[in-house]
Amino acid sequence: MKPKHFDIIHCIDDNYGPQCGVTITSICMNHSDVDITFHIMYANLSKQLIEKLRNQVAIFNKSIFFYKIDVSVLENSPLEGGKTLPLATYYRLLVAQYVSPEVHRALYLDVDMIVCRRLDAFYQTDMTNWAAAGVYDISTLDHGPSERLGYNFSLGYINAGVMLINLDYWRQYNI
């Protein structure tokens, strides 16, 4: 059974605006029969980019919401946001604080991808008692990141750019 609605999260800055537009278009073209709400998390976006994305989503008769992130929450975190990765990389960690409590699950997707198939099966993954579902990151042949973090690589390593988030769980456990 196909889901009737998807909530999709993207975290961007002005540098990734054009890529976000391409990702949104690819999602919409593969899901014309699904009601989709896009949730865009950002710290700084130009008014022109916001308007472009609004217009693009409207072409496909989908919805879009924008959430301006208070980056001060991340700047002093142990993640050292912005030093090795763009600060926007970490916005997904705040999704449960920004998106409406009426949204129970959301699919986070990086914007440097083109969706070529339907996402129904992944979106419907049973999330009972799980914070998130991800896909194995097959590009992690270099075990450096897991060793640096003290993580047992044999447990698997997910690609954080494709993640189904159980927002109810995140809110319950204050993630």
Outline where the language-model segments fall.
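Glycosyltransferase catalytic domains, chiefly GT-A lineage
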Residues: 1-175
